Structures are given as C-alpha cells and as structure tokens.
Amino acid sequence: GAPFFMILGRFFTLFAGGNTELVALTMNVLSGLASAFTILFLFWTITHLVRKFYGYHTGYTLPQLITILGSGLVGALAYTFSDTFWFSATEAEVYATSSLITAFVFWAMLKWENIADEPHANRWIILIAYLMGISIGVHLLNLLTIPALVFIYYFKKFPYTRNGFLLSILASIVILGAIMYVVIPLIPYFASRFELMFVNGFSLPFYSGVVFFMVLLFALTIFGIYYTYRKKRVVWNTILTSFFVIIIGYSSYSIIMIRSIANTPLDESNPETIFTLKSYLNREQYGDRPLMHGAYFNAKPTSVEEGKTTYYRGEDEYFEVNKDRQYTFNPEFEGFFPRIWSSQGKHAGEYIYWANLKESDLYNMRTDQQGNPVHGRMGQVQYDRNNPKAPPTFGQNMRFFFRYQIGHMYLRYFMWNFAGRQNDLQGHGEPTKGNWISGIKFLDEARLGPQENLPDFIKNNEAHNKYYFLPLILGLVGLIFHFRKHWKDAWIVTLLFVLTGIAIVVYLNQYPLQPRERDYAYAGSFYAFAIWIGLGVTALIEGIRKRVKSVAVPVGVTVVTLLLVPVLMASENWDDHDRSDRYTA
C-alpha cells in the first residue's frame, strides 16, 4: 500500500546480492538509516530554534555554543531512545521512512526561513512540495506538517495580526484539504472518466484514457509553469511548480497498477484498472468511519440505498456492476461527533464499560412469550441488543472520547515514551497490561494498585521501563520556556505536536479492542515533544546563568540532563529493544 516505500525497499534488497537470507536484513537497514537521518534532522531543528534565541549568526560565545549543541544533543538522543521511535527503527515498516520525511520537511522549511529574502529561496518550497508528493506514497500522516509550514511562511513574510493569524489557519486547512480531497482522489477520478469515455465510447484500447489524461494534465501544468515564468508571476509559478512536483511524487502509485497487471502472488484488491485503483486509494476495503456526524453503535438500519457505481473490465470494454450499499438510520440515533459508533457486537460491551453506560438506558428488556423479563444465570435482567431503546447522550459519547480515544489510545502512549511503561502486554484497560507507569511507587499504586504481587512474567517484563517523569518534566520546562521566549516558534511546534497527535485521534475515530497497539501512529507528536526536551536544556542553562556566569554551567547542565534523560531512557529501554539473537525459528 506504500509504493514509494516499496521501491526504496526493493532498492535496498539489491544489496543482498541474490541471497534471500539477507533480504530481511537489508530491509531493516533501510529503517535504521531512515531513523538515523531523522535524528540528524531533529538535532539540526533543535539547534536552529536555540540559535534564534541568541540571534541567527556565526559569532557565538563559548557558553552559547555549548548551549546550542547540548540542547540539540539531549533532545535528539531522548527521541532516539524513546520507546515508539526505537521500535519503528528496528522493523521493516513504513513508519521509520515516514518519520524521516516529516523531519526532513520540517527542517527544510526552517532552512527556507533563513534565506527567505534571498533570490531563488522558493526552491526550498518546491523541494518541500516534492517531498509531500513522495510522502503520499509512504504515509499520509506526513501531510499533517502542512499547517506548521504555513505558519512558518506567515510569520516570516508578514507582520502578525489577528486577521492574518486566522487567514493562515484557513490557508492551512485549504492546502491540506486540497491535497487530501482534491489531488489524491480527483486525479484518479478524472482519469477514470477519460478511461470510460475512450474505451467504452471510442472503442480504444484499455488504459488509453488514463494515458491521455495524464499527458494532458502534465502538458497543461508545464504550459502554466512556462507561461507564469515568462510573465514573471512568481507566486503562481511557485504554486504550479509545486503542484507539478507533487504529481511527480504521487505518480509512484502507478507501480501499484503495474504490479497488479503482472498478477504478482501478492495482489490485494487487484488494482489493475483505474477503477479498482481508485477504490484502493480511497481505502474502501476498510469501510467508512463517521467523523463529524453519524449513527451511534446501537442504531439499527431503517433502509438501504444504492451508493457509487463500480466497473468491471470485460474483454474489450468496462461493464457496470452492482453499486455500493449505504445504510440509513433513524435520525434519533444519529448525532454530532459520534465517537461510539461501531455496531460490531463485541464493541458494545466495551462502549458500555469505557463510557459508563447502562444497558437499561440503551436497550429494551428481553421478554418471553408471556411478556415477562428474561433473566440470566445470576438472576440479572437480560437486554436485547437488537432492540434499541434510546441512543447514548452526547456527554456519554464524549466520555468515551476522553477516556478511551484520548486517554487510552494517545496519552497512554505519550506517557510510555516520557514517563515509563508497565510491560509490553497489549492492554484493553486492565490494570496489569500495557499501562504507563513512572517508577514512583505511591503515584503508580494510586492508579493501578499494588505492583509487587504481580506474576513474574508481568513484574519482570523486559518492557518494564521507569523514567520517573524526568523526560516529561524537561519537555514541559522547554515548552513553557519556548512560549515565553519565542511564542511564534512555540506555536509552530505546538501545531506539529497537536496535528500529529490529538488530531489523528479525532480523525481515526478508533473503536475499542484494537488488534494491536497504535503508538506508531503518533510518532510525529513525540518528535515535536522531543524538540521541547532539547529546549528544556536551554531553559535550565539560561535560568542558572542569570545567577552564575560561568562556562561550567552549560557544560554541567548538558551532562546532568544527558544522564538523567537520554542515558536513563537508553538503559531502561535497551533490553526490550535490543534485537540481537532474536529469531522467528
């Protein structure tokens, strides 16, 4: 599903030299290298932000230089040895490469900020656009950096005003929406319309409409670039060039169709026509999830309506096949921002638990033929989950959002990385599996109960890691310091932190009993917090130097924070992240 990552992976497997035993190793080398460069860009990002506190020039004093490098070192190493990032760095998956693109894009925009007033500075914006196009073929999470990039541009080019700030938010939404809901879906949509017209209408060969549309799109875009260049329309030239390179990056998805046409052994969804590719790109095999409006989990369908038409490839033309089915529900069981929506039977009990619901409020009682209530073995009244009584309230809906989606599926992972982790057993709310801990006994026992009497396989789990809140505290110090010293940059990092964290929680709208832990989805948010960990070092140095004017201060603070945060994290995480001598057989 990630074609550019697949191409990169194929390139790295060439270094196996035909030895299939080394293919897995070379794929993991790709993740390792991508992760290493991610840390490099994080180091450069932190040092860039610290340099702005002292004025962006080359003549720094020795204490300032040590502060800059020490902050970058501590912040970058803290992220290096964080639980989520370290795990993704040692597996052959897209998330290490995705982290690299996120880090590269954010750093590149800061690089543009330095030279924004120089000739040809827009080449950095075009590079970023190209990376965005490539990232579509790796993971769509990278697009969430766009609002932060828009504000870097706004703060550099325009004086701050309230209206300008609001317009920048609007521009962020428009650009992000244009890529996600115009470029990505509409290019294959229009290609499919041309394909249908050329094949069914003009009796031309298969794929002729797709080829014609792509040639036409490229030709019109190139002409627009040439025309705006001749007319010296710099802004429009940059926009069209950026659009062009986004399409070039997005074109990696053509490899998906090429592989499917070749009928490779692994050919999920068979996307060999533009119509099946369109379904593949829209992730229709995963179904729909309501975002801002939809039915609650105990709603029952009232009718079925026909949805979109799909087409099947025949011998010499495309045939219309059955349309998708769309269920409609009683409006009383629909609501705004539905978080408890999944109608799968096993999820109902979880919604009842997490949102503190009562079955008696949601369902009618089961009754026998005489109309008497049916009781279970323990004498409890049984309720018919196929006979809804009333929908949950909005407050109950939001309780699930905060307790499960925010608390269990985001904050728990955040605390894994910056406070500590109980074990690597997947948990669904149990006090003994997969919770966050701090290592401070009375705080952990207040939440989870006594931890000493647990079985050895839980108590002595390799992933039992304790950081005593030290990374979290240092990051919060850096956050506060950042807003006090340079609120504009702090706002930009906050956007990155929120959009790659809580915003993903809102968009995914996850149901309970997830098949695996999902911390990898929020690696970008943890990356942003690592920036504040680095700035926390700067905050401590500057606070102490107000009283002690000595070069020993930045050296001492760097060494102490290095030992208390990244070294502590490395020592705690090493045993459960070291993959030496781990084999499947």
Regions found by a protein language model. Name each.
Residues 174, 243-247, 483-487, 531, ...:
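Signature aromatic-anchored transmembrane alpha helix within multi-pass, membrane-resident enzymes
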Residues 55-58, 62, 66, 105-124, ...:
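Membrane-interface transmembrane helices that cradle and orient dolichyl/undecaprenyl
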Residues 14-15, 20-28, 53-68, 75-99, ...:
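Aromatic- and kink-enriched transmembrane "portal" helix at the membrane-lumen/periplasm boundary
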Residues 70-73, 115-133, 162-175:
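Short hydrophobic alpha-helices at membrane interfaces in multi-pass membrane enzymes
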Residues 1-21, 32-33, 40:
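Short hydrophobic/aromatic helix or loop-helix immediately within or flanking a transmembrane segment
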Residues 514-538:
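Hydrophobic/aromatic-rich transmembrane helices and adjacent perimembrane loops
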Residues 29-60, 104-108, 473-480:
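Transmembrane-helix motifs of polytopic, lipid-linked glycan transferases
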Residues 113-114, 145-177, 181-239, 561-568:
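Perimembrane helix-loop-helix junctions
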